[in-house]
């Protein structure tokens, strides 16, 4: 059916046996790694002969376990680029009655991430390297939308996981460009900088062949040949800025927490007394607090947004203390410019 309609057939198959069945049935794309055993040479040959594209999706399975166990790494990419509200829900469990949690979540919270994930990760890495070495078409994909794997922010994390399989940065860039285009049959239009192809281009400040994180250094975007400045694309609302600040606070990430504030930030108490001014004073005020209070968690009990002001009723767990208060955040030009704490 898909072939008759000139469509690619992508199949979810994570076991060697089901992957074999899928390819024999005409699958053009395997959208997950084979993770139950090392792929034998005859199947590697079959994948290459049939021009099957392999998308490893290395991080998605473990991200479920990280979320359910509460062992979130709070990767910088997530704190900076994931949907701020969606990411914030991952820590909602901290404010819940743990006795009411589903049994599966209780198990993860008690036992942590099972060791079998280590074996799965190892098998996936070995298979990925074997296929790349054999010349099988490998493309980047994250399966974003699953629990703990977010659109946009999961991309660099997937590349970092692929890098652990001993792939070169050039391998990773090919997987994200021309290989993906080949896999979906659109390499005549996109995937490489060639005459006659659509001019969809990222211009970077730093060389991604030196580090995949340099893909974050986007200077300009060209879409269909039209230049787009980055700062015209991502203009977060005041509420989004404050939510991203909250996520960094709950992650106890001092750098990304401070990054949501303007350099001349002023923080006042309810009587108008200036408590802190500027990033340096904020860092001095919060760094040790973040480091030492390992159970830190701020729950927003209520929120009101009025133009550029975000008013949060906050409940903070800090060690053995529970602190209640109201914070008024004033946002200008995408940064928190002023904070007033109300008793």
Question: In which residue ranges do the predicted regions lie?
Answer:
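A beta-strand edge to alpha-helix "cap/lid" segment located at domain peripheries
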Residues: 247-250, 268, 273-274, 281-343
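Divalent metal-binding pocket/active-site signature
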Residues: 1-28, 36
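A cross-family glycoside hydrolase active-site/sugar-binding cleft signature
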Residues: 10-12, 31-33, 55-58, 141-143, ...
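Acidic, glycine-enriched loop/beta-strand segments at the rims
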Residues: 150, 168-173, 182-218
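Divalent metal-coordination and catalytic microenvironments
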Residues: 2, 12, 30, 54, ...
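Short, well-ordered alpha-helical segments enriched in acidic and aromatic residues
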Residues: 251-268
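Structural recognition of alpha->loop->beta junctions
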Residues: 20-41, 158-171
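Active-site neighborhoods of metal-dependent hydrolases
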Residues: 39-165, 231
